[in-house]
Amino acid sequence: RQVEKYGKDTAFFSTNCAMQEPLIASILKEGAIFPQQCCPSPYHGYPAALGIDVSGHEGDVQYMLDSIKEKLTEAGQEGRMSTWAVPVNMLMIEAGVEYAIEFCEGKTDGAFDEAVFTSIIDKLAAEKGTTCQLSKYEDGDVKLDNFFLLLCDYYDFSK
C-alpha cells in the first residue's frame, strides 16, 4: 500500500529483525528501495525472502552475495537493494575473539587497546573486500571510549 501511495522511489527500513524477511519480499515484489537491514548481513532475511537454499554453503558469504545478486537482477532490483559484504554479527564476534587472543597473548597495552582493535576490524573488513569505519559513541557531553559504532560500505549488487 505504501509503494502505491508514495511511489517506487520510496526507501523502506525497519529495526524489527522479524520483519526483515517479509519486508525484503514485499520490496522486491513492489520494486521499492531497500537500503539495508537493521543488522546488515547477507544472511539477515535475504535467503528466506528470496528462496535461496543455503545448504552446503553455510558461512560462505560470497556465495550468498552472488545468490542475492542473481535474484535481484532477475527482478530488476540489483541497484535498489543492499546489505553489507561482511555480516555485522560475524564481524563483531570474530573481532572480539581475535582481540581476546591478542589480549591473552599480551599483545595489547592493557584493558583496551584501540589501535589493536581498529587494526583487527580493518583486517576483517578488508578480507571481505570492504572497509569499516569506527566511531566512538557520543551523546552530548558523554563520550564512551570503549563503545564503538561500526559502519561498513554498502554492497552494490549492480556491479
Could you describe each region identified by the protein language model?
Residues 1-159:
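A residue-level marker of the well-folded mature domains of exported/periplasmic proteins
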